[in-house]
């Protein structure tokens, strides 16, 4: 069961694209969003050298979202070292405890778990060269850190980074909208999907059409080709993992190999379209 949450957000310079601090009621964690260009200002915070984990966000040469996941005993000092790296990152999120209760073992544990969460979600390309080592910790500490992870994920998402969110996390929990929708169409198209908070998710194993029609738009053709090149669609034209499209129509078009209106093409087990449910 999900509960309502109260989030406190402090925008340091009145600029929503600048430095932001986020906290959650009754939680000792704190999350900072810092741009690369404003990292020096972070050093002025009393807790800037607290222990924690951090995430560096950027784009690769193909314009795909990337993330580097790290841990630090002294947060600002570690982040400053990354300024010497090539410009593979633009923004940073640092997660610390306000009372500095996290130790090195805690940070290593968090680094490993966030790495695995990001890999599982598949939202961004994780550019760590190795899998972070997971520390051995007590059952008490593990329970505490699992709650820490859950709260940190919520705040990272609130700041606009869905890097750790799986399809299950994003499913819209509202009446008929949380049921599966299906497409079974020409040229072998056979897919199922779900409405999620940031678009429409097509499930792993769904099959797309074996060919496309000549009238399919260039942008859709490029998207289909890109998904095949990245291995998200395999040689059998099936999705290798759950994949979130920005809209039901985009998802339907890739599945059917032609321009499509997703609000009328996707139907649930009762043969109701998304349009039917929205207007009922």
Where are these regions (language model features)?
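Hydrophobic/aromatic-lined pockets within catalytic cores
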Residues: 84, 115, 119-123, 160, ...
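Polyanion-binding interface signature
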Residues: 172-265
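Internal, well-ordered alpha/beta segment that forms a basic, Gly-enriched binding/recognition surface
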Residues: 90-150
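Hydrophobic side chains in beta-strands
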Residues: 56, 72, 94-96, 204, ...
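GIY-YIG nuclease catalytic motif and its immediate N-terminal context
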Residues: 1-84, 101, 105, 109, ...
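Short, solvent-exposed polar/charged micro-motifs at secondary-structure junctions
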Residues: 103-106, 248, 275-276
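Short acidic beta-strand-loop surface patches of small beta-rich interaction domains
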Residues: 266-279
